[in-house]
């Protein structure tokens, strides 16, 4: 992937960048692997806003991704690399030798014509999926399960990966992208390699309208609201916060306050917390 830089033909174009989509080989998705996707605009079933700053945006169809990779000992050929509007990573279309089709996250370095497979005896090759206990120490992996058979949940965004540090019986130690080291059940599966489209984070959106296309609405600062809307609101002119510490819109302390439950069951599986955590 390369970054495409636009000429400053307008204020909106100035500094705008995007992907050149050079890796994309197929423009229309596989119809049998699509599902409808309705928009909620951040509302729940009561119509109450549960996630702010969401609404509008371009219509999308959901691409059904195989995060489980449980079709063992059946080889599949990569026939296309496609764009997926629902995630930062690209996706790869597989054609299995038994005739079935599936989408997977497109790993870095995987090209059209490559072959992949999954299973306990799969080779240590980019795109292959196998249990953590069968993956050598130091190997880069992505799409990692937290529960056997549930499907990959960790390291699925563009450019992300984790590193296998070693197998210790029932558990395998893995270093995540954040620097956190945690134990994961050795029966859980992971896919070899890092997720592709690694330059996605370098894209400059460039203008507000492009954010609206993605369903993101404007965000107002609390200090410009009324006091009944935000703890920072009110006052004459540019007033200070007026409290010992910045607050969330719901009156809780923000910036630096720990939000993770210290009694969470998975806390005992974390060997070292992520970088920057106090």
Curated annotation (Swiss-Prot):
GO CC aspect terms: large ribosomal subunit
InterPro entries attached to this UniProt entry: NA-bd_OB-fold (IPR012340), Rib_uL2_dom2 (IPR014722), Ribosomal_uL2 (IPR002171), Ribosomal_uL2_bac/org-type (IPR005880), Ribosomal_uL2_C (IPR022669), Ribosomal_uL2_CS (IPR022671), Ribosomal_uL2_dom3 (IPR014726), Ribosomal_uL2_RNA-bd_dom (IPR022666)
Signal sequence residues: none
UniProt feature, compositional bias: Basic and acidic residues: 258-270
GO biological process, one term: cytoplasmic translation
Region (Disordered): 208-278
Keyword field: Ribonucleoprotein, Ribosomal protein, RNA-binding, rRNA-binding
UniProt-recorded Gene Ontology molecular function terms: rRNA binding; structural constituent of ribosome; transferase activity
PROSITE patterns: RIBOSOMAL_L2 (PS00467)
Comp. bias intervals (Basic residues): 209-219
Family as reported in the entry's similarity comment: Belongs to the universal ribosomal protein uL2 family.
Subunit record text: Part of the 50S ribosomal subunit. Forms a bridge to the 30S subunit in the 70S ribosome.
PANTHER family: LARGE RIBOSOMAL SUBUNIT PROTEIN UL2M, RIBOSOMAL PROTEIN L2
Described purpose of this protein according to its UniProt entry: One of the primary rRNA binding proteins. Required for association of the 30S and 50S subunits to form the 70S ribosome, for tRNA binding and peptide bond formation. It has been suggested to have peptidyltransferase activity; this is somewhat controversial. Makes several contacts with the 16S rRNA in the 70S ribosome.
Name the UniProt record assigns to this protein: Large ribosomal subunit protein uL2
Origin species: Lactobacillus delbrueckii subsp. bulgaricus (strain ATCC 11842 / DSM 20081 / BCRC 10696 / JCM 1002 / NBRC 13953 / NCIMB 11778 / NCTC 12712 / WDCM 00102 / Lb 14)
């Amino acid at each position: 992937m390369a970054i495409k830089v636009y000429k400053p033909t307008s204020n909106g174009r100035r500094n705008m960048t995007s992907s050149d989509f050079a890796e994309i080989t197929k423009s229309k998705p596989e119809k049998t692997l699509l599902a409808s996707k309705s928009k909620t605009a951040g509302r729940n079933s009561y119509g109450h806003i549960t996630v702010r700053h969401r609404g509008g945006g371009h219509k999308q169809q959901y691409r059904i991704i195989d995060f489980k990779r449980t079709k063992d000992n059946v080889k599949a050929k990569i026939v296309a690399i496609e764009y997926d509007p629902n995630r930062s990573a690209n996706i790869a279309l597989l054609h299995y030798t038994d005739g079935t089709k599936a989408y997977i996250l497109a790993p870095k370095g995987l090209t059209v014509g490559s072959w992949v497979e999954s299973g306990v005896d799969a080779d240590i090759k980019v795109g292959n999926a196998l249990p953590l206990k069968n993956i050598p120490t130091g190997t880069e992996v992505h799409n990692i399960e937290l529960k056997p058979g549930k499907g990959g949940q960790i390291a699925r965004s563009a450019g992300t990966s984790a590193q296998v540090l070693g197998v210790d019986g029932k558990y395998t130690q893995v270093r995540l992208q954040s620097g956190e080291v945690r134990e994961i059940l050795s029966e859980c599966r992971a896919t070899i390699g890092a997720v592709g489209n690694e330059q996605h984070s370098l894209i400059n959106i460039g203008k507000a309208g492009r954010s609206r296309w993605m369903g993101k609405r404007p965000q107002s600062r609390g200090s410009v609201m009324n006091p009944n809307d935000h703890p920072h609101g009110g006052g004459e002119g540019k007033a200070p916060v007026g409290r010992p510490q910045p607050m969330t819109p719901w009156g809780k302390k923000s910036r630096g306050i720990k939000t993770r439950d210290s009694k969470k069951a998975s806390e005992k599986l974390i060997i070292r917390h992520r970088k920057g955590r106090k």
